[in-house]
Amino acid sequence: MSERADEEGLQGKLRLLRLLHQTNPYPQGPGTASQRRNRRRRRRRQWLRLVALANKLCAVPDPPTDSPLDRAIQHLQRLTIQELPDPPTDLPESNSNQGLAET
């Protein structure tokens, strides 16, 4: 189950990176050579920042999973005493020959 959580965390990080990449399209459009060059430079800097962010996201370790001791403590905390019915107030009379066949 831990592997599934790790996989879901990684998929979330990849979705975030994909969204960031899609919001930073390659520059297109008319303009002078210097304008196009500056747009490409800006995009390159933005791309490098995105790569740095991706490295930080992947480098951050996931929070540690619960140790067996923590799980045992949580299990004990969830335990409750069940409501038991009240004991009978009057005891039935016992016969000495109860359960014996009469002869």
UniProtKB/Swiss-Prot annotation:
GO terms for biological process: mRNA transport. Residues 21-35, 92-103 have a biased composition (Polar residues). It comes from the Viruses. It is found in: Host nucleus, Host nucleolus; Host cytoplasm. One of its GO terms (molecular function) is RNA binding. Its main location: host cell. Residues 19-42, 80-103 are annotated as: Disordered. A motif (Nuclear localization signal and RNA-binding (RRE)) lies at residues 35-49. A motif (Nuclear export signal and binding to XPO1) lies at residues 71-82. Residues 16-24 are annotated as: Homomultimerization. The keyword Transport applies. It holds the Pfam family REV. One of its GO terms (cellular component) is host cell nucleolus. The RNA-binding motif binds to the RRE, a stem-and-loop structure present in incompletely spliced viral pre-mRNAs. This region also contains the NLS which mediates nuclear localization. These overlapping functions prevent Rev bound to RRE from undesirable return to the nucleus. When Rev binds the RRE, the NLS becomes masked while the NES remains accessible. Homomultimer; when bound to the RRE. Multimeric assembly is essential for activity. This is Protein Rev. It comes from Human immunodeficiency virus type 2 subtype A (isolate BEN) (HIV-2).
